[in-house]
């Protein structure tokens, strides 16, 4: 990478890969959780994530590039960690708590990436990309807030 535009495109490919990987991994998480509100929130976010992939394709188009992913080691690690929780978790309440924590780790990663991409788009004068990325960033923040609320009000107290 030699320019900010290069870094922007590389990171865009990274999150495109990540969102596609998340859509493949999330159904297993949904199946593994037993809390109804958490299950619903994750199902809603899966639908939202599929929409975000389409939005990312529009971002690529807005900068004159073809949508493509580049392997994201960070998301692979977070997914692997989540799979470990699914396989090793025994108590339903503790498993729900650990899985919501893993899901929030993914959300925090996405928030960091989309925040960076949005600001780079602004710096590069890519107004359409900036607006589209702002929309995704807002969705990720809302998803994280919803998970946080469920964790605080329903999951963490019984997990003691």
Pin down the residues of each PLM region.
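Amphipathic alpha-helical hairpins
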Residues: 1-160
């Amino acid at each position: 990478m030699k320019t900010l535009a290069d870094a922007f495109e590389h990171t865009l490919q990274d999150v495109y890969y990540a969102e596609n990987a998340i859509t493949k991994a999330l159904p297993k998480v949904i199946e593994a959780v037993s809390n109804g509100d958490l299950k619903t929130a994750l199902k809603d976010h899966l639908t939202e994530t599929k929409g975000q992939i389409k939005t990312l394709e529009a971002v690529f188009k807005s900068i004159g590039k073809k949508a493509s992913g580049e392997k994201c080691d960070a998301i692979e690690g977070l997914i692997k960690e989540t799979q470990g929780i699914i396989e090793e978790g025994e108590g339903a309440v503790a498993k729900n708590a650990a899985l919501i924590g893993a899901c929030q780790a993914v959300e925090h990663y996405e928030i960091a990436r989309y925040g960076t991409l949005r600001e780079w788009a602004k710096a590069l004068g890519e107004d359409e990309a900036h607006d589209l990325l702002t929309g995704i960033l807002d969705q990720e923040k809302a998803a994280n807030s919803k998970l946080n609320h469920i964790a605080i009000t329903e999951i963490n107290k019984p997990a003691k």
